[in-house]
Amino acid sequence: MRRLGIGYRLLVMGYGLVVMVGCTQQPQPVRRLSEKQEVDSALMAQMAFNMQMASAADQACSNWVKNDSATYVLDEFGFWYSKTVNLYADSLQAGDAVGMHLQMAELNGQMLADIEDIFTVGSGDLPVAINRSLKQMGRGEQMRIVAPWYTAYGTEGTQLIKPYTNIVITLTINKE
């Protein structure tokens, strides 16, 4: 009978030990999501919700524009505008301080705000739809803006305007 070498016997014993240990291991507990993964999934859910809300807002604003008698232009940022008083005045520039009258209403006509104040063009104090519209206006001109919530007061809203509110803005620039 042939004797196996010590190396072969150790190899066989080691293999048996590995097999035995492998069979007796306890199942690992299911790994809980990390805090970062939980935040990421909450963020993804919020983004999906906002995308649905934006799509509904686009449809609502588009329908409102179709039912109005004025001719509107769709801005690349997603809001509609129509110059209702066009004096062909020089366009306002970033940094210009202008007196203006803002009337804001929901798409159903419910008045939300009626504000007369002095604002600085491009200061970031105003929503995107208003800031971009100001750059296309001159003194004494008027524009109607139909703004979905994401170009108006967004997910935060204000004291007067609830979050996710689509609004119609009548914007009049004072002559002086």
Would you name each region that the model predicts?
Residues 1-23:
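Sec-dependent bacterial lipoprotein signal peptides
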Residues 23-176:
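Cross-family detector of peptidyl-prolyl cis-trans isomerase
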